[in-house]
C-alpha cells in the first residue's frame, strides 16, 4: 500500500461480488460471505428540571429543585447490501473459525437457534450480530436553606439522588450467553456554612463548599 498499488489501497469490489455470486448452497441459492452493514444508534432521551424558591420572610429563604433524565438507546446493525448474494447467515464468522464443531457457540442469536434448530437467515434490512439497549436513569433532588439574621448568616444545602445504568440485551450470543450486572449509584452530598460579618470568615464549614 505504500507504493499506492490499487489492489492494496482500494477494496476489490469485483472479488467480493464474485465470491458471493458463485457461493451456491444445496438449494441453488447464493449465500453471501460478504455484506455491507449499517451500524445504528437509535436514541430516546427525556430530560426534566424544576426549580422552586420560597421566602416567607426576609430572614429565611428556601430553594430547591429536581432534575430527571431517562435515556434508552438501541445499538444494533443491519444488512444494507448482500453484494450479489440471496441471503446471509447470522453467525459469528470469527467464532466459526475457532469453534466450528460447536454450532451453539457460533450463533449471534442463540435463542433463535434453539427454537428453530438452525441459524437465522437474513435479508436486506434485517438486524444481525448484536442488538441491545443501553438504559440510563438519573434523578437528583437538592435543597438549600439560607438564614440571614443581621450579622449572622448560615446556609444549609443537601443533595441526593440515584444514578442507574444497565445494558438490556435483546439477543443472546453463543460465546457469551450470560447476563450483565446492573450499575447503580446512590448520590448524596451536603454542606453547612456559617459566617459572622464582624470577621467575614467562615466559622463552620462541613461537607463540600465552593465558598
Can you name each region flagged by the protein language model?
Residues 1-72:
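Outer-membrane beta-barrel domain signature, strongest for Gram-negative TonB-dependent receptors
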Residues 35, 61-211:
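Signature of Gram-negative outer-membrane beta-barrel scaffolds
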Amino acid at each position: 500500500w505504500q507504493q499506492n498499488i490499487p489492489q492494496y489501497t482500494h477494496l476489490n469490489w469485483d472479488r467480493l461480488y464474485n465470491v458471493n455470486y458463485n457461493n451456491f448452497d444445496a438449494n441453488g441459492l447464493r449465500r453471501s460471505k460478504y455484506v455491507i452493514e449499517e451500524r445504528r444508534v437509535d436514541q430516546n432521551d427525556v430530560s426534566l428540571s424544576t426549580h422552586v424558591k420560597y421566602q416567607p420572610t426576609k430572614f429565611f429563604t428556601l430553594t430547591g429543585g429536581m432534575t430527571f433524565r431517562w435515556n434508552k438507546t438501541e445499538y444494533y446493525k443491519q444488512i444494507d447490501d448482500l453484494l450479489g448474494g440471496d441471503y446471509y447467515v447470522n453467525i459469528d464468522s470469527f467464532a466459526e473459525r475457532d469453534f466450528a464443531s460447536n454450532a451453539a457457540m457460533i450463533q449471534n442469536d442463540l435463542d433463535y437457534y434453539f427454537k428453530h434448530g438452525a441459524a437465522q437467515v437474513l435479508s436486506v434490512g434485517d438486524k444481525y450480530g448484536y442488538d441491545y439497549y443501553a438504559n440510563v436513569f438519573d434523578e437528583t433532588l437538592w435543597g438549600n436553606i439560607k438564614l440571614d439574621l443581621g450579622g449572622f448568616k448560615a446556609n444549609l444545602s443537601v443533595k441526593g439522588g440515584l444514578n442507574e445504568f444497565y445494558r438490556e440485551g435483546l439477543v443472546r450470543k453463543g460465546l457469551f450467553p450470560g447476563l450483565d450486572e446492573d450499575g447503580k449509584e446512590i448520590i448524596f452530598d451536603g454542606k453547612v456554612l456559617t459566617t459572622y460579618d464582624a470577621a467575614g470568615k467562615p466559622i463552620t464549614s462541613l461537607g463540600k463548599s465552593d465558598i
